[in-house]
Amino acid sequence: MVFFLLILLAVAVAGARPCGPGEFNTDYLDKKNTTAVNGIFVVLVLFSHYVQYADFEGPFDMPYLTLRQHLGQMVVATFLFYSGYGMMEAIRRKGDGYVRKILSKFWQLLFRFDLAVLLYLAVNQILDIHFPLREVLLAFTTWTVIGNSNWYITAVLILYVIMYISFRICLSG
């Protein structure tokens, strides 16, 4: 696994160039740069999920397992930060019009999540794995899980609600 990490590192720095003397990158949080950084973390998230299903006991796997242990679920922190920053910039530029759209973002995300839950239910049905009705219904709200990991979706949905309520109060007053 450490070889995959080295390849990822090489790809990540391949196009990088240091700023010259007296130069400052004012676009460090623009969409192009943040997408590149998020790409690195997408791969780390995929590696992290892959480790749950494969055996990694070789000597070349230990550096990655140590890194994974230290990073934990923080590999998604960049997504939360950049999303929040992007939403704040959109609110700064578009104001109340954008704030009103946050609820539709909430419902779109929940709908997509529920489609994934349906897929899990179908696979579990095929595998003859059954869950109580209450647990299934709560899984559609992200309150419980039926084999899927939902903590990130729950966090994003809650942050959407907090942001919507906060800005509705701030912009109306």
Regions found by a protein language model. Name each.
Residues M1-G173:
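Membrane-cytosol interface segments of multi-pass membrane proteins
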